[in-house]
Structures are given as C-alpha cells and as structure tokens.
A protein has these predicted regions:
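RNA pseudouridine synthases
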Residues: 1-227
Length: 227
C-alpha cells in the first residue's frame, strides 16, 4: 500500500503529514493522483513533495477512550494484538482527525512496538489486528496482500438478496477527479469481488454475511448498492 510505503520511506515525517500529502494530491503514482490504499507494483514511479522531518506531534487521547479500547482487546500474544474496534472510531489520524485507535494504544503503551496490520473504515466495527514486532507485521502484511486472510462482515441491508448466495464481481472506483467522492461500480475501476450470504430476512431488509475477496474502499456498500 502507498501509505505504508511512504511511512517507511519518510521516517520522521508525521503520519498526519503523509496522509495530508496524499489527500491533497501531492503524491502521484505514474503521474496520476493516488489514494492511501493504492497498491504499488514493481516499476511504478512515485512522486512525492519535499517533506519536513520532525517528530510526531504528541497526541493526547482521553482516558475514557483508552479504557474502552483496553476493554475491547480480544486476544494478545507477543506477536499480535486483536481488538473489537468500535464503530465511529478511526484506526488512525488523518482527514481532519487528530487521533485514531493506533494513537490511543501507543499512548496507553509507551515504548511498545504497535503497527496496524490492516484497516477498517471509521464507521465499521469488528476485529482489528495489530502487529507487536516487525517480523509479525511483515508476515501479516503478506497474508493480507496474498488474500490468505478471510475477511467476513455482518451487515443489515435495505432490500432483499435475489438468491441465498450472491457473488458481485464488479470493478470499483471513485468518480474521476473526486478524491473523496463516493465509490461506485465503473468499468475502468479496480477488480473487486464480494460474496453475500443471506442469514435472515426482515420484511424489506435482510441480515447478511459479506465476504471480501478484495479490499477496496467502501467495497461492501458499493457492491450491495449494485445488487
């Protein structure tokens, strides 16, 4: 991912500054605007602006938030930390947010190695995996990249599935020139695949399990809207 690459490359540059550069279009891949989640391939040319190196600005996350996250931890080992991320809480700072889950945990555990192995949308709740050392981060990143991690989400959908199991294989992209616009199905988009399984129906609504075989931004809602 572009953001992970830049964090590694621009050591000492605050993450908030890196995400701001991406969001404002200052970072380009092969001459085109990029997203934080853009995947880099061998031979890609990445253009970045001059960046001032300085320590991260201190972040002060409220004690009640940090307590909530401590209570949300589901599993912990010397390599991993897994917690049930609450809906409405971003995983990292950026886009006008001064802190995220990773910042709160780092404040709560000063001096510990903690890195996000993946991301969840701000409004999505569920299992968030963090690495507790560099080797674990490398292995987890490879598993997410290679698709060996199974990602399943429970969703309440407005409308009914036409069948008990529906595969949506439709490319996704934002509207041209809109870095923060909605993600929609577009022929020129990135390959995206979601499998919806019906769990229960409630009149005009249904409760489904959505399994992601790709990891595009807003993939579930875009594919659900496409059914």
């Amino acid at each position: 991912r572009l953001d992970n690459y830049l964090v590694t490359l621009l050591k000492g540059v605050p993450r908030s500054a890196i995400y701001r550069m991406i969001r404002t279009g200052q970072v380009r891949i092969n001459g085109s605007r990029a997203q934080a989640a853009s995947r880099l391939e061998e031979g890609d040319e990445v253009r970045i602006p001059p960046a001032r190196t300085r320590p991260d600005e201190p972040v002060n996350v409220a004690e009640d938030v940090r307590r909530q996250l401590r209570q949300a931890i589901l599993f912990e080992s010397r390599d991993l930390l897994v917690l049930d991320k609450p809906a409405g809480m971003a995983v990292h700072a950026g886009s006008g947010l001064t802190w995220g889950v990773i910042d709160a945990l780092r404040q709560d555990r000063p001096g510990e190695y903690l890195e996000l192995a993946h991301r969840l949308d701000r409004e999505t709740s569920g299992c968030l995996v963090l690495a507790r050392n560099g080797q674990a981060l490398g292995q987890l990143s490879a598993q997410f990249r290679d698709g060996t991690v199974r990602k399943r989400y429970l969703c309440l959908m407005d409308g009914l599935l036409p069948e008990a199991v529906v595969d949506v294989d439709a490319p996704l992209a934002r509207m041209a020139g809109e870095s923060r616009g909605p993600v929609t199905v577009q022929d020129a988009g990135k390959a995206s695949l979601t499998r919806f399984r019906l769990l229960q129906s409630f009149g005009d609504c249904c409760y489904v399990e959505a399994e992601l075989f790709t990891g595009r931004t807003h993939q579930i809602r875009a594919h659900a809207r496409h059914i």
